[in-house]
């Protein structure tokens, strides 16, 4: 639903879509359909856990800026954290094992990788929708997200 909202804004502001967007979008939606057939339990998620939203204070760590919070696959937050903190494959595995409290199943690993794609797909659209207000910087941000999403798409 959020992707469609950003797509509508991109059209409204007459920002150019990515040249291969139609094909890439179809592949992303096919993966999304495959994931949704397994019906991962939705839980309350932050949906924007970039490093700047983690604040240390009073001997604890707080997660702030909950404007995008909602029900989602928990793998979204874990995938987003991995992307934003530039985790290696080893750190990804440690993160998942710590979160789950056990070894990761193939299905869970697939969901994690798929959510990395979904995260960058959505933020690449957000960036494009912000181009009229952020210019070249937003265009570069959008392309960085889109290209990384395509790299991850080629691995799945």
Which residue stretches match the model-derived regions?
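An alpha-helical support segment within catalytic cores of ATP-dependent transferases
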Residues: 1-47, 57-58
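A glycine-centered beta->alpha junction motif in the catalytic cores
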Residues: 3-16, 121-139, 143
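Pre-DFG segment of protein kinase catalytic domains
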Residues: 44, 62-65
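Conserved protein kinase catalytic/activation segment
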Residues: 53-62
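Active-site activation/catalytic loop segments of kinase-like enzymes and analogous catalytic loops
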Residues: 75-104, 117-135, 148
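Start-of-helix signal in alpha-solenoid helical-repeat scaffolds, especially tetratricopeptide repeats
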Residues: 110, 114-118
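Regulatory N- and C-terminal appendages and interdomain linkers associated
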Residues: 149-156
